Amino acid sequence: MIILKRLFSNMSILQPPEVVRGMTKLEKEAFRMPVDFPVIEIEARDAGIVGRRVRLEPYLIGHKLKPLKNLVDSEKDGKKYLVFHPDKVQEDETRFKILELLKRELGNEKLLDWTTLSKDLTFENWDAKSIFKAVLPVGIDYSSYTQTGHIIHCNFADEILPFRFIIAEVLLDKVNNCKTVVQKGNIITNVYRNLDLELLAGEDNYVTEVKETGLRFKMDFSKVYWNSRLSHEHERVSGMFNTQSLVYDACCGIGPFVLPATLKRKPKRVVANDLNPESVKWLKVNVGLNKIKEERIEIHNMDAKMFIKENVADDVVRLMLEESTAGEFENEVPKPMSEVHVVMNLPAYAVNFLPAFRGALSRFKDEIEKVPLDKRYKWNVYCYLFAKSHVDVPDSWYEDEARRMCDEKTKWERSLVVKCHNVRTVSSRKEMFCAQLELPYEFLLAEPFPDEPEAQCESEEAEEPSSKRIKVDT
């Protein structure tokens, strides 16, 4: 009994009625609830003075009960009500203090006093977070989702699955520009990185458009991979390029790396590839949308390993030989040497592409040996991967695991990983990293690895952190 009293004593008056608890099908009328709001009536012409000079924000209802506001019209002409939060002005001392503050600014001759404004709060007044808290079982929360254009995509823990349809209806109603809500199933469960979607509410329309760092990206969300959480990562990596960079994106998707790189960094060469024909289709659309000349990005639709072994290797050697033999004009300012940047953003599988680099240039050994060491391009590879544990481990373990995964695939005499950037936490025991490798020519010219059976593509099942990570001492 004591525990229940404490629980309910902490509950706010301004929350949806308890009758909606456990609701799985949206019934808006059930959210209607009469509330008596404490108010003070003031002259409408005094509203500006009160807003500027009297600090009442901690006591007013705030902005969570839209369209209800802190200041509303009174029934009397020329009058306004200051609307207070019932929980915050329960004490007589607090109410007296507020009246004194108002009289000090407006004058003691003003007849100010507390009264009550009766209002029905409805579904329209409650925000999504308050509705979810009221509907879901006590102790279970849901507040995180990702929006891509007009599409909201959700992941649900098992205990929330029975409530997915009402959550979807609420999001459809409450989130600006939302027209479609889907449940996002396993990601990257096939070679095309398609999303396994369940339509929960709204239109069955997955063609949408988003803006990222000022660029337009159009896509069929059901047929390509897009993650809005990676916008800073796209900007970080593309910001490493310059006018002498040779950029090769082995898993380009619809262009989140190559488009900003091309427009903002103006690399010497940009070549994009993706195995998914839909990604290639929408990349070409986005090249046009962003007014990029077609010849600035060479686009391929092929396996990433073959792209690395054939297209990247051929292209780099050709350009390097051209640059190393080109004569310099007198008084010409020497240009910095070009660098190779290969991006592999397929975190569930990209680490399996690393063996393709060993010996990728071996068939050009004679030509490369003629290139002076100071004319040989530096090779940088950005390999995205997941480091995950099945038990609680120290935070430092995840970076060590990411490095180990790369070393296991390169099998070189030393680690080729020069930097491991933590991109984001995927779940409580799963981290996403970008491992940056620098590949020496000894590795690129070494005997290639024998072909191995294709590794199974890991599913990227949980996008939301399911719980906070337990701190483990090292």
Curated annotation (Swiss-Prot):
This is tRNA (guanine(37)-N(1))-methyltransferase. Residues 452-464 have a biased composition (Acidic residues). InterPro entries: MeTrfase_TRM5/TYW2 (IPR030382), SAM-dependent_MTases_sf (IPR029063), TRM5-TYW2-like_MTfase (IPR056743), TRM5/TYW2-like_N (IPR056744), tRNA_Gua_MeTrfase_euk (IPR025792). Residues 465-474 have a biased composition (Basic and acidic residues). Its main location: mitochondrion. S-adenosyl-L-methionine binds at H234, D274, L275, D303, A304, N345. Keywords: Cytoplasm, Methyltransferase, Mitochondrion, Nucleus, S-adenosyl-L-methionine, Transferase, tRNA processing. It holds the Pfam family TRM5-TYW2_MTfase. It comes from Caenorhabditis elegans. GO terms for cellular component: cytoplasm; mitochondrial matrix; nucleus. It is an enzyme of class 2 (transferase). The lineage of its organism: Eukaryota, Metazoa, Ecdysozoa, Nematoda, Chromadorea. It is found in: Mitochondrion matrix; Nucleus; Cytoplasm. It catalyses: guanosine(37) in tRNA + S-adenosyl-L-methionine = N(1)-methylguanosine(37) in tRNA + S-adenosyl-L-homocysteine + H(+). Transmembrane segments: none annotated. Its EC number is 2.1.1.228.
